[in-house]
Amino acid sequence: DFKDEEFGINEMRNFVLKHEKSKLVFSVTFSYPANMTLETIVETIREKAKNMEVTCVQHYFPVKFEKDCPMVSLLSKAYEKITHLDGTPVTTTGGTYAKLMPHIVPFGPSFPGQKGIGHQPNEWMKIEDLNTNAKIYALGIYYLGML
């Protein structure tokens, strides 16, 4: 049971089970909180799956920025200026694109009532919210340009 107060719980998704060269291969994608290590997760899986070979094929470290770092503060400021809502940053175990390049803050504003709509089948967003996001991104880029 891996969890972190800020990031939430470890997520497992993209399950694939296939037969390969007389072996049954089970693949899964994990997104895990920054307070965990890959080694801890792999060891836990090995303990639970004693008769199976466990291999990490690809790994990206979790992304974590302090809430008061300049980039996060400016993006929060842009959110608050456009929405007039509390822009206190929250985090998840996602942010895949930010794991591929250093110094990229994963930023995707969400609005009240939108919990859990991202990365789901038939992902959706209201046109009004899409327009609000565009305004937030534009102002955020403007603010970041002042760093």
Residue ranges and their predicted role:
Residues 1-13, 18, 35, 53-147:
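An extended, acidic, His-containing surface patch that forms the Zn2+-binding/catalytic region
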Residues 39-50:
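Short amphipathic alpha-helices in soluble, non-transmembrane regions
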